[in-house]
Amino acid sequence: MTIDTVILDIEGTVCPITFVKDTLFPYFLTKLPSILSSIEFPLSTSSSTNDDPIIQILKQLPESITISNESVFSYLKNLVDQDIKDPILKSLQGYIWEKGYEIGDLKAPIYKDSIKFIENFNKKIYIYSSGSIKAQILLFGHAEKDQESINLNPFLKGYFDITTAGFKNKSESYIKILNEINKSNDPSSVLFLSDNVNEVKSAIESGMNSYIVIRPGNAPLSDDDKSTYKTIHSLDELTL
């Protein structure tokens, strides 16, 4: 088996699964009220000419939601609390996180073995996450290494999210990615790494190779899963 392309999940694979839920999500909800308070509600049709990126994102919500900043906050907080993969939410989160990274509030705790792999794998690496592509680029652009912020994006070939590839538990999403990266005729040369069993199963159904990455804090695997799928605990274990 010759692998020349690796697709990486983010949460629970290259960084702790707790980073998103314990750091990024709370940061978003902390900053959101002050941002919403600066916007005039209800959003009128005249807002369509406003080039404020926040307003342009919020305009995609149903009018029944954008009647007040309280209703918008309640709606978005519910999506966050339920961990619903909503594209509008992801866009807004990406914008707010960008500001957090820029001012140094946020740094991404990428695992050391993941940084090492990304920096030294001399073939193609793609990212596929439910988080927006913008959020992915921000995260890898502000990876923490030796207490400094480093940019890993130059080592990455491209990015996919639920708006460009589809949901990660669907095999057709991986087939779409194979087409996008010109690997539809050679899917076995592609390896997808994820902490999620359903994602790994879907990737395998597309013809890719796929391993489950076991990290501290990840959901425990059943004995059946451990016997069915190849597992690794670190990207250092890869021999490609």
UniProtKB/Swiss-Prot annotation:
Gene3D superfamilies: 1.10.720.60, HAD superfamily/HAD-like (3.40.50.1000)
Binding annotation for substrate: S129, S130, K168
Classification via InterPro entries: Enolase-ppase_E1 (IPR023943), ENOPH1_eukaryotes (IPR027511), HAD-like_sf (IPR036412), HAD_sf (IPR023214)
Top EC category: hydrolase
Enzyme Commission number(s) from the entry: 3.1.3.77
Reaction(s) catalysed by this chain's protein: 5-methylsulfanyl-2,3-dioxopentyl phosphate + H2O = 1,2-dihydroxy-5-(methylsulfanyl)pent-1-en-3-one + phosphate
GO MF terms held by the record: acireductone synthase activity; magnesium ion binding
Keywords for the protein's UniProt record, in alphabetical order: Amino-acid biosynthesis, Cytoplasm, Hydrolase, Magnesium, Metal-binding, Methionine biosynthesis, Nucleus
Gene Ontology BP, a term: L-methionine salvage from methylthioadenosine
GO CC terms in record: cytoplasm; nucleus
Subcellular location: Cytoplasm; Nucleus
Pfam families for this protein: Hydrolase
Positions annotated to bind Mg(2+): D9, E11, D195
Cofactor note text: Binds 1 Mg(2+) ion per subunit.
Pathway membership, UniProt: Amino-acid biosynthesis; L-methionine biosynthesis via salvage pathway; L-methionine from S-methyl-5-thio-alpha-D-ribose 1-phosphate: step 3/6; Amino-acid biosynthesis; L-methionine biosynthesis via salvage pathway; L-methionine from S-methyl-5-thio-alpha-D-ribose 1-phosphate: step 4/6
Cofactor requirements of the protein: Mg(2+)
Function field: Bifunctional enzyme that catalyzes the enolization of 2,3-diketo-5-methylthiopentyl-1-phosphate (DK-MTP-1-P) into the intermediate 2-hydroxy-3-keto-5-methylthiopentenyl-1-phosphate (HK-MTPenyl-1-P), which is then dephosphorylated to form the acireductone 1,2-dihydroxy-3-keto-5-methylthiopentene (DHK-MTPene).
Family: Belongs to the HAD-like hydrolase superfamily. MasA/MtnC family.
Self-association and partners: Monomer.
PANTHER family (UniProt xref): ENOLASE-PHOSPHATASE E1
Protein name: Enolase-phosphatase E1
Species whose genome carries this gene: Candida tropicalis (strain ATCC MYA-3404 / T1)
Lineage: Eukaryota, Fungi, Dikarya, Ascomycota, Saccharomycotina
Gene assigned in the entry: UTR4
